[in-house]
Amino acid sequence: MPTGTSAEPGTDPVLILGGGLIGLALAHELARQGLAATVLSRRRSEAAGFVAAGMLAPHAEGLDGRLLELGQRSLERIPAWVARIESDSGLACGLRICGIVVPFASAAERDAYPTAAHGERLDRSGLEREITGIGPLWRAGLLFPQDGQIDNRRRLMRALERACVHRGVRFEEGCEVLGLVTEPQGQQTGEAPGEQLAAVRLRRADGQELTLPCREAVLCGGAWSSQLLPGLPVFPVKGQMLSLQGPIGALSRVVFGPGTYLVPREDGLLVVGATSEPEAGFGEGLTPAGQRQLQAGIDALLPTATGWPPMERWWGFRPCTTDQAPLLGKGPIGGLWLATGHHRNGVLLAAISAELVAGAMLGQQSDAGLLEAFHWSRFA
């Protein structure tokens, strides 16, 4: 890791501020494009990429507008993106385009769903065909065969980290970024007045504090992003989850119910999520109320799973914005880029976020309009 001395002009690596899924995806893409990248991460284990269920569900989640477009673009790119990660890492990522079923209490609710036109309509018999043992409350449904899942918790994160190493990305784990150092810009270049990123202040795992010069960095700090950039509209939404061990093949589709979803892995593990607790802030730990909510969701969606043995219980923090869409592209400081605020769609949007932000950093103009829709200035 570089010390406080400046590197040769033009050789400074791009600093990735955050080692979660989005940060790793971006570091890998930049390295593929020939740029040096260094990932600064306090504790990668706390990243949302390790605790999410891994759904790829732009249609099942009922997204709309530009966020739906962003999700669809990413979904299209994910097979090739995963193939590159698997090639660079030698590890499988657990991608399954297995389809997602959204159950409803009535056909009217089904037909009013924002993305109903993208799915196959199911009646009660169709629900029973797709989800063996589905609870009696549900009378209609939508099947989105184009949606799916990836095993982020056990496979994708490890594979992506190894792929980054393969591409020469450097890592500094246990490194806390304390602040950004800026300098005036525009005085000599004729650019509009403003601030230019000059360095980051950080504390390494051994306690050493230093100032690391840099001209470009990407803020991928997830729910903690506003701690580095006060005023950035990103806040934590706590989520609790659990997993059960079911029989292999007992459930082939993801089930996306109201307040609860069931994500079956190939080995029979059933990932159950998730509470949504914006009032919890960064409060850690499981709660009886949260676990009761998950259990009630299992009882309603798939009663047969109530007897399956529990495996894990965990929690994490989604990085949310007030419109529940990410912040992508140029930041409010020259040289600082944003890739954060993905809320519950970080796994889905990792591929397109890395592509768009890396492309913009390299001066590529493709999809500039889509990137602009997620610029931070929409909150200004």
Residue ranges and their predicted role:
Residues 153, 308-380:
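C-terminal catalytic lobe of FAD-dependent flavoproteins
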Residues 54-133, 139, 297:
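Dinucleotide-binding Rossmann-like beta1-alpha1 core, especially the glycine-rich loop
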Residues 207-256, 284-287, 304:
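Central helical "cap/lid" subdomain
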Residues 50, 248-334:
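Active-site lid/adjacent beta-loop-alpha segment flanking the redox-cofactor pocket in flavoenzymes
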Residues 62-63, 91-102, 124-167, 275-279, ...:
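Helix-loop-beta segment of a Rossmann-like dinucleotide-binding subdomain
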Residues 8-20:
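Beta1/beta-strand and adjacent pyrophosphate-binding region of the FAD-binding site
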Residues 143-186, 190-208, 212-215:
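Helical element adjacent to the flavin cofactor pocket in flavoenzyme catalytic cores
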Residues 31-50:
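Glycine-rich FAD pyrophosphate-binding loop
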